[in-house]
């Protein structure tokens, strides 16, 4: 796909004179354009849901969720991956973010790395990619060689693959088994795909990882019941989670959490089923860690 023909490289008439307006009007123009992004994502919800189901099936079978991108797209993947262990208590490495140029590229522009097909393949080889894994290639343009080559390699291994881009019919979309293509239109600053395209990608990644965690039993109601208490704020959140899930008071919630080494799921089952920590944990294990199943089937 030629660069000049890409929607993400087009000129936005709404911002054609943004350099001549007041600061407040600049903000209004940007905000008005940003309002269109959730609607673009809404149009591809069926594609996102299909990807979530595939990701969940593979992860349930022992696979991993791998994000692969360059520049802003790579950073968004790393951001999403890095939040999964503290929020949902999963092991580091279950959700992996890879960026062209490696760790240095998280904070710095590393010229030319996104054009390296070998880089995309080698980064996947270095994490010992297997057919159980799901590779999600992220590229606003849909033409990034690093991502395309990684998706091709993943498919050769038998991996399920997802391509996220903002240009219809892009190489990323056609290379991946599942395509998610929110069309956000031309950017406020021509070609600055960190803006609307980046926002759309972030919304999609939020859904992919959150959907996976909900389907994996990491959410009860709308509570993050596997949150790891790594600071005082999260200690308080754990207490509130147990309170909200059970109707008990703060003292009862804290006592249950202490008794089970601060595992929210176990504490919730302890309170709701009037069990000690060992028995509550046993029942959770019997039902794959799903609180709902413990409550509904016993």
Curated annotation (Swiss-Prot):
Pfam families (alphabetical): GKRP_SIS_N
Family stated for the protein in its record: Belongs to the GCKR-like family. MurNAc-6-P etherase subfamily.
Single Gene Ontology MF annotation: ether hydrolase activity
Upregulation: Induced by MurNAc 6-phosphate that releases the repressor MurR from the DNA. Repressed by MurR in the absence of MurNAc 6-phosphate.
Protein's UniProt name: N-acetylmuramic acid 6-phosphate etherase
Catalysed reaction, written as an equation: N-acetyl-D-muramate 6-phosphate + H2O = N-acetyl-D-glucosamine 6-phosphate + (R)-lactate
Keyword Iron: no
SUPFAM superfamilies, alphabetized: SIS domain (SSF53697)
GO aspect biological process, one term: amino sugar catabolic process
Active site: 83, 114
Keywords: Carbohydrate metabolism, Lyase
Subunit structure: Homodimer.
Extra information: A lyase-type mechanism (elimination/hydration) is suggested for the cleavage of the lactyl ether bond of MurNAc 6-phosphate, with the formation of an alpha,beta-unsaturated aldehyde intermediate with (E)-stereochemistry, followed by the syn addition of water to give product.
Pathway: Amino-sugar metabolism; 1,6-anhydro-N-acetylmuramate degradation; Amino-sugar metabolism; N-acetylmuramate degradation; Cell wall biogenesis; peptidoglycan recycling
Highest taxon of source: Bacteria
Function: Specifically catalyzes the cleavage of the D-lactyl ether substituent of MurNAc 6-phosphate, producing GlcNAc 6-phosphate and D-lactate. Together with AnmK, is also required for the utilization of anhydro-N-acetylmuramic acid (anhMurNAc) either imported from the medium or derived from its own cell wall murein, and thus plays a role in cell wall recycling.
Residue ranges constituting the SIS domain according to the UniProt record: 55-218
EC numbers on record: 4.2.1.126
